[in-house]
């Protein structure tokens, strides 16, 4: 596995909130969240859509970015969502 293939993603949940996470394979991670095998939060509030915020990072950088995004306000996350790369299933 390439050390610089980690992505930071946002999931829009059915309650209109955003869930932030990292993965070396975001498409596979979305499938896990959708199947109820992801985070507890996405088991309760089902995913509606996912967007990639940033990619091509090593795991440490991705973790630091995730922490920073989780500290943002809902409005700031919404803006980040609007600027993020759409997943193929969303286009």
Swiss-Prot record:
CDD domains: GIY-YIG_UPF0213. Residues 4-83 form the GIY-YIG domain. InterPro entries: GIY-YIG_endonuc, GIY-YIG_endonuc_sf, UPF0213_domain. Pfam families: GIY-YIG (PF01541). Belongs to the UPF0213 family. This is UPF0213 protein NMA2126. It comes from Neisseria meningitidis serogroup A / serotype 4A (strain DSM 15465 / Z2491). The lineage of its organism: Bacteria, Pseudomonadati, Pseudomonadota, Betaproteobacteria, Neisseriales.
């Amino acid at each position: 596995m390439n050390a610089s293939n980690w992505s930071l993603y946002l999931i829009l949940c059915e309650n209109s909130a955003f869930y932030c996470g990292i993965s070396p394979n975001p498409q596979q991670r979305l499938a896990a969240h959708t199947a109820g095998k992801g985070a507890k939060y996405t088991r309760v509030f089902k995913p509606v859509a996912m967007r990639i915020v940033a990619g091509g990072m090593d795991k440490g950088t991705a973790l630091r970015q995730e922490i920073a995004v989780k500290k943002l306000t809902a409005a700031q996350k919404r803006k980040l969502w609007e600027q993020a790369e759409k997943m193929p299933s969303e286009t």
